[in-house]
């Protein structure tokens, strides 16, 4: 099979192409009163966040990675006027709660913008002061202090979550929180209309119309045969089963097993990749709380049963044994965040110490602030490339969260 624009058969194969989103004006539309609704704990300083992100991108380029930007691809995908019009309609249709019937005024604003300006504006949000329409609804006469007709999308620089590259296909995800649900509309248009992707017959394992929630931070490609997916606050068991069935029924897919790993439903354990990432053939970073749960975990191995022509599910309580079995590795090493210390581990977990981006076997990108975890990784033979993330981390995501691999070399 000839390689297309998407190929990800592992977490550790040499990274060749990655999708990023440079932080933009959406971060400056964060205000204290509405942080919770937009899933932020704090407000990053945009200028510094952009410098940190630019350095992250440059580090990847220096390691031979082609860096693509979501915002640029999205703008290039709506060159056709009809596609642009459909894109605007789709965005507004998913924003009815806030636009209060002012579609035409917002469209008039959009009509003054270039394709890139349009994409940037949709990402950053539309403030009410930008259009000042005549009041036509009773609700508009009320003392509503909410400042936006179109909400900002400050989480977009975490490109891992709205989509996930799996094999030669992709999931276009239905996000759990309303604040993030519109994010996957960009990759939908990119895959369907961008010249780089539109004629590649890319399998869509799940699309954003799927009724079940799934997010890319819970989707890990351990090998060409095995996926690991977190059952979390943001990813449902129903979505995992649907994904497994779609992959198993595709004759071009190589995956034979899907390992569903239940994790606690809290912000500290937002996604599987915030507590667990693969960094070498036999090494994983791991939050100590997961290590302590060993022997009492809910792990489910989903396979296709050729005899019964249906999926079969086996249960396990030991993550180490399960991974060694499905990956065919004798002795997997778990490397604890913050060396498992009750203080260092908790602090560095909060700052995404487990959320490493592997760019080839045994080489990872991490935040420099997680120095205890980074030193331990080096002791275990891992090459650690550190980046500054004092502002980026305020969104509660690390290098893996901020990147969506589109192409990795096979291992």
From Swiss-Prot:
Pathway info: Amino-acid degradation; L-arginine degradation via ADI pathway; carbamoyl phosphate from L-arginine: step 1/2
- Keyword Transmembrane: yes or no? no
Identify which residues the record assigns to the active site.
Answer: 401 (amidino-cysteine intermediate)
Gene Ontology terms: biological process: arginine catabolic process to ornithine; arginine deiminase pathway
- A GO CC term attached to the entry: cytoplasm
Q: Where in the cell is it found?
A: Cytoplasm
Among InterPro entries, the record links this protein to: Arg_deiminase
Q: Which keywords, in A-to-Z order, does the entry hold?
A: Arginine metabolism, Cytoplasm, Hydrolase
Q: What is its EC number?
A: 3.5.3.6
The GO terms this record gives for MF are: arginine deiminase activity
Q: Which reaction does it catalyse?
A: L-arginine + H2O = L-citrulline + NH4(+)
* Entries under HAMAP family matching the protein: Arg_deiminase (MF_00242)
What family is it from? Belongs to the arginine deiminase family.
PANTHER family, per database record: ARGININE DEIMINASE
Q: What is this protein called?
A: Arginine deiminase
Give the species: Staphylococcus aureus (strain NCTC 8325 / PS 47)
């Amino acid at each position: 099979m000839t390689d297309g624009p998407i190929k990800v058969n592992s977490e550790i194969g040499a990274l060749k192409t990655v999708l990023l989103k440079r932080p933009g004006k959406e971060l400056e539309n964060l205000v204290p009163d509405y942080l919770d609704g937009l899933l932020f704990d704090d407000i990053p300083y945009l200028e510094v966040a952009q410098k940190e992100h630019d350095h992250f991108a440059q580090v990847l380029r220096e390691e031979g990675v082609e860096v693509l930007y979501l915002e640029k691809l999205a703008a290039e995908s709506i060159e056709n006027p009809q596609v642009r019009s459909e894109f605007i309609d789709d965005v507004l249709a998913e924003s009815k709660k806030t636009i209060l019937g002012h579609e035409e005024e917002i469209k008039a604003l959009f009509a003054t913008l270039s394709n890139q300006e349009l994409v940037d504006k949709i990402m950053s949000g539309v403030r009410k002061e930008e259009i000042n329409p005549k009041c036509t609804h009773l609700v508009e006469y009320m003392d509503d202090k909410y400042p936006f007709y179109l909400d900002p999308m400050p989480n977009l620089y975490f490109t891992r979550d709205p989509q996930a590259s799996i094999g030669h296909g992709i999931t276009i995800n239905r996000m759990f929180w309303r604040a993030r649900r519109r994010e996957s509309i960009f990759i939908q248009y990119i895959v369907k209309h961008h010249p780089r992707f539109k004629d590649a017959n890319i399998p869509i394992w799940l699309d954003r119309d799927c009724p079940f929630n799934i997010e890319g931070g819970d989707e890990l490609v351990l090998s060409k045969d095995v996926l690991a997916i977190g059952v979390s606050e943001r990813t449902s068991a129903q979505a995992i089963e649907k994904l497994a069935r779609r992959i198993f029924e595709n004759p071009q897919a190589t995956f034979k097993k899907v390992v569903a790993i239940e994790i606690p439903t809290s912000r500290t354990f937002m996604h599987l990749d915030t507590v667990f990432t693969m960094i070498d053939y036999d090494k994983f970073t791991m939050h100590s709380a997961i290590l302590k749960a060993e022997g009492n975990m809910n792990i489910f191995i989903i396979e296709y049963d050729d005899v019964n022509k249906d999926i079969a599910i086996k249960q396990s309580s030991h993550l180490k044994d399960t991974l060694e079995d499905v990956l065919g590795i004798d002795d997997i090493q778990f490397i604890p965040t913050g060396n498992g210390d009750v203080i260092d581990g908790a602090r560095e977990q909060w700052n995404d110490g487990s959320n490493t981006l592997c760019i080839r076997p045994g080489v990872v990108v991490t935040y420099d602030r997680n120095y205890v975890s980074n030193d331990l990784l080096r002791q275990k033979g891992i090459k650690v490339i550190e980046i500054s993330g004092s502002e980026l981390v305020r969104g509660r995501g690390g290098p893996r969260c901020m990147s969506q691999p589109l192409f990795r070399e096979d291992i």
